[in-house]
Amino acid sequence: MAAVTEEPRIRLDPTQTCRIHLCSAGVSVLLDISSASLPWIVHWGAALPGLKAAEAASLVAVAVPHRTGNGQDLPVRLDVMASPHAGWSGRPGLVGDRDSTAWTPLFKITEVHLEPLEPLEPLEAVDPQEGVTDSTLTSVGAGTLFVTAEDPASSLRLAIELELTRSGLLRGRATLTNTASRRYRVQELGLVLPLPAQAREILDFAGHWGKERVPQRRELTVGTHLREGRKGRTGADAAHVLTVGEPGFGFAEGEVWGLHTGFSGNHRTWAERLFDGQQVLGGSELLLPGEVSLARGQSYTTPWLYGAYGRGLDEQAARFHDWLRSRPHHPVRPRPVTLNVWEAVYFDHRLEKLAALADRAAAVGVERYVLDDGWFGDRRDDTAGLGDWVVSADVWPEGLSPLIDHVTGLGMEFGLWFEPEMVNPDSAVARAHPEWIMAPGDRLPTEARSQQVLNLGVPEAYAHVRDQMVALLEEYPVAYIKWDHNRDLLEAGTRPDGRPGVHAQTLAAYRLMAELKEGHPDLEIESCSSGGARVDLGVLEHADRVWTSDDIDPFERQQMHRWTQQLIPPELMGAHVASGVSHSTGRTHTLHFRAGTAVWGHLGIEWDLTQADEQESTELLEWVSFHKDHRRLLHTGRVIRLDAVDPALQMHGVVRADRREALFAIIGAALPDVEPIGRLRLRGLEPEFSYRVQDVTPGAAPHGFRRPPWWPEEQGAVLSGRVLQTVGVHAPWLAPDTLRILHLDATPG
């Protein structure tokens, strides 16, 4: 196969069969490509370092299955589009038609090129003595493969991008273009990634408001495990990362393969196993009827789909975290400790009260102050005013300047709450422009939280919202927007005919975020959606953090934090210290447990600090100071979650990239069935290092805490990484809802 190198691009001859090997961070992707078919992923999994052309040819040969009994005459070679012509009888990657024709296209590759991120290995000539006469192997490190294919009979062109990132994350997307004069209706366009036979257990997530990302497991059996999001947002019940792995896999053990559909609107994510044993992960946008109808020359591009392989869930999560942290727009300055006033005042906006909150916040080390819902229009409760983004003269007769001046005078940034995609029927904008409300026609959808959806797909509505927001950003020094989204998009059509508009609405929301940030480069955005119902890699192309959940109860947050981090790193995960009695669950928790839970994310406070006594304020200051002291480690380190030796005890931590420093939390989740529980083995350390282990938990020891004899006192205990990882140390006794934090520092020598 001829290859032409035009740094940094390598053009490959599409008329000849070729094999491409991408290898980075312990992951290999081997693709077999020929003009007769779309790319076939022969291997996606553990690295194959030093792979040679002859070995690749052999690998391709042994990967072809035999013909099934009474089946088609050629073995099935599953391509990334799950094409039916290749013999795949499961869910196809493309569903569409042109007046009931062109519904099963046969694409032929017309162009292949490769853009390596890492140095190119020399192209290896074919050795005829080994019988490999039809191809060579092109091997690179991280890089992106671009494939263009056409079907002249169907008048369709397909472009596929597959990128292996430096972190070993495999991401892909496809673009379909109509080249005929008649429209082509796209019902679905997605990609699939292959799963090996040993991947037989599924882990994905369920949830609801106040309890997001609840793990659930099941066997991958013949059929389709399909997770659809039809709410116009990611959903509190989203699959999050749909993982299939070796039965019994955990945080450290077992090979796992996972897929995330990076889109904030309607979407599909699935795992499928056929009668012949072939199995895949797939993802796509879920398109409603007529949302994508392509005229000549028009194109539709899928969301990015993200595939993450790892040995254990922690390694899989690290691939997402490392990639997110490598983005040029990833937040790099220390994440400001944030006060959000919502649970302190709700809609009771009084300057005196809010200024007093600012005073108390500054005194405990807060760096950003966020004014939540209730500052605009007639928004005195949640039944009116939404959509009128003008400061209320009734509540703020002098505008927001008196509060903002007070906040910034205390050295804090100022943030403001918006819900740009929503509207109350009782609002000036709804009365003036009822045609901007999304609906299936003449009737309105059922209200949710007394609100409807404002159609940002209508240019005039988009401009109205944008201009009101820009006016506020230009009048006031707003450094941060809490961007909320508090209802599902059900029956969300564009008036007057009611055609579905979720696709256009989602892209318009992205465009509005991008436009605001382009005009205000230092602006940060938080993605909030009834709490944690918009946590995905699509919105994180524009947002700087997500709100994990409206439920700030630390008992619930322990699990939500644990599993939210399967996709996103701690610095993007909003984690707040709330009042002693949870506003969501009614549970009562000590400040020790509330703060000890929150410091592991992007720390914030959502508590009426004017009601905190002196002892609570002093303890809170200690926790905020602790977070700031360790913020760099917490927000750059490798996340470690330990499989429980006993369900009564949980443990997680972060380890610095060079393994010279770590923090671990030991959490009492319940009363154990046995006492003592036994030894805890830490992970992620360097076996040859010696570590000084210290208990650095702020405040006094919690009720019932019983130390084992080895427990580090003030000077700390020195133990090797090998001992800590292989043998372990005896756990302390912790009462439920208490915790200890250990700091590990590699000693010199």
Each model region followed by its residue ranges:
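Polysaccharide-binding surfaces and accessory modules of carbohydrate-active proteins
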Residues: 18-21, 29, 40-272, 690-710
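Conserved, mostly hydrophobic/aromatic
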Residues: 26, 174, 297, 339, ...
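Carbohydrate-binding surface patches
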Residues: 26, 242, 644-687
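Short Pro-Gly-centered flexible turn/kink motifs
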Residues: 109, 292-310, 736-744
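Aromatic-lined carbohydrate-binding/catalytic grooves of carbohydrate-active enzymes
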Residues: 332-467, 480
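Active-site neighborhood of glycoside hydrolase catalytic domains
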Residues: 397-399, 431-433, 437-592, 600-607, ...
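C-terminal beta-sandwich/jelly-roll accessory domains of carbohydrate-active enzymes
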Residues: 455, 670-749
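Catalytic cores of secreted or luminal carbohydrate-active enzymes
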Residues: 592-640
